[in-house]
Regions:
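A general structural signal for well-ordered alpha-helical segments in protein cores
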Residues: 78, 114-115, 210-217
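C-terminal helix-rich "cap/oligomerization" subdomain common to oxidoreductases
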Residues: 2-43, 56-60, 64-65, 214-246
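Short beta-strand elements of ligand-binding domains
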Residues: 43-48, 66-70
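Short, charged/polar "capping" segments at the starts of alpha-helices
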Residues: 50-54, 77
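Rossmann-fold dehydrogenase core element
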Residues: 55-74, 84-97
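NAD(P)-dinucleotide binding in Rossmann-like oxidoreductases
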Residues: 149-214
Length: 246
């Protein structure tokens, strides 16, 4: 594994403090085993939806961390978007998430990640249900903590520059987050609308992947224990209990 990272990280053959595992099926078992073997933390790249109960328990018992490296949710601009949403001085009226994916196999994963992002930026998602589903599109509705309605739409097709969008509307303004494909060098963009006009927040030229590894440094230096698994599990449980993805 190679990356442009601070010098405090280096690749070693054995007994690594941090291990990276693929998020393909079975990743929770692989990550759990890495922690049991003494790793202080695990980075999971592109995790698929799986139960995380055992892994969360192991991480707590070992005082270890698990960081999920995801295509959209790991983008550092989500922090800016969350702060912008929290500064809105009126109740939120509506939240809209839309995303384009390249294949049918990506649809359910995009729904799962969208729920995580809504949770992180706006608030916990509830009452989620499928309104419409065809072979290449899915539309869901729900609400967030506080009662504001939420829609999530995922479509299979070409993404023009930025495949993921989150829009939060309130009587006093709005926040728009657009996240590029992780394979590009473009930054995510956060735009804030108010009575004074439109403001684009300063760009953060850091990829989701690099941001994930920067969080590894923070976990060591400050003892951070990220909420990744909690948010991931909350999305999984919500989709299992309240929305039929078949």
């Amino acid at each position: 594994m190679a990356a442009s990272l601070p010098a405090t990280l280096e690749l070693v053959a054995d007994n690594a403090d941090v291990r990276a595992v693929s998020g393909a099926a079975g990743w929770t078992d692989r990550a759990n085993q890495a922690l049991l073997e003494g790793a202080l933390g695990v980075v999971v790249v592109a995790p698929e939806a799986e139960p995380t109960d055992e892994l969360r328990n192991t991480a707590a018992e070992q005082n270890a961390f698990v960081i999920l490296d995801q295509r959209w949710r790991s983008n550092p601009a989500l922090t800016d978007a969350r702060e912008a949403v929290s500064s809105i001085d009126a109740p939120i009226s509506f939240i809209e998430i839309s995303a384009n994916v390249s294949s049918l196999q990506d649809v359910d994963g995009a729904v799962h990640e969208s729920v995580q992002i809504a949770h992180r930026v706006v608030g916990a998602v509830q009452d989620l249900r499928v309104l419409h589903r065809q072979s290449r599109t899915v539309l869901l509705s729900g609400s967030v903590a506080g009662g504001a309605p939420l829609t999530i739409s995922i479509a299979v097709g070409p993404a023009i520059e930025r495949p993921f969008h989150l829009r939060v509307f309130a009587p006093s303004g709005a926040v728009h987050l657009s996240v590029p494909d992780p394979g590009t060098a473009a930054p995510a963009i956060v735009t804030v609308l108010s009575a004074d006009g439109s403001t684009t927040l300063p760009n953060n030229w850091e990829s989701a992947h690099r941001a994930s590894w920067r969080r590894v440094i923070a976990a060591f230096q400050r003892g951070d224990r990220p909420e990744d698994l909690h948010e991931f599990n909350a999305a999984s449980q919500l989709l299992l209990s309240q929305a039929s993805m078949s």
